[in-house]
Amino acid sequence: MSKKRLLFIEDLYDFYSNKYKRSTKFSAEKTGEPLVVQVHGRVNFDESDKNKDGLLPVHLQSCHTDLNVNGSNIESSVMEAALPSFSNRPILGYIHKVTTDENPEGQWEFYSHNMHEDENGDVVYDEYPIGIIPESCNAQLVYDEEKKKTYCEVDGYIFEEYSKAAEILQREEECSVSVELSIRELSY
């Protein structure tokens, strides 16, 4: 396994604007691998589809198009072309118990992208599949009136029996997530 580090798109933008400070181009065709970054999104518990025993329906709002807070830009046409890539992907999560003075028994919560190094120095990701985005995920670009942005939205399912993920989503109704973007071409 190669040494990888999870990078948010803000980290990538910060690197190019504050550290690298020169024009550059990236092409997955030349390197043989895409550049993978995380973007922030939301997942909502969706009570509208109760026809799947053992599967909790969820609705995910992932990245938005056009100019981002960090100065990066994802064109609508690029996002539209990438919509099919959401199908048949796992929903990953890392869950841990949080105890507080007010709640010494603890409560299960989602955590961030936990990872550790194995004995060979390779990065091992501690997240595990907690659900699936099926082929019928209804991936589409949707304008969010409140946020005044167009987001990629998909439907998925959380496994009810295999983790505490469904319990957390039913309790919280909405949770923050990050979504992987695979960058095949980039210029700065």
Model-derived features with residue positions:
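Signature of dsDNA virion morphogenesis modules
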Residues: 1-188
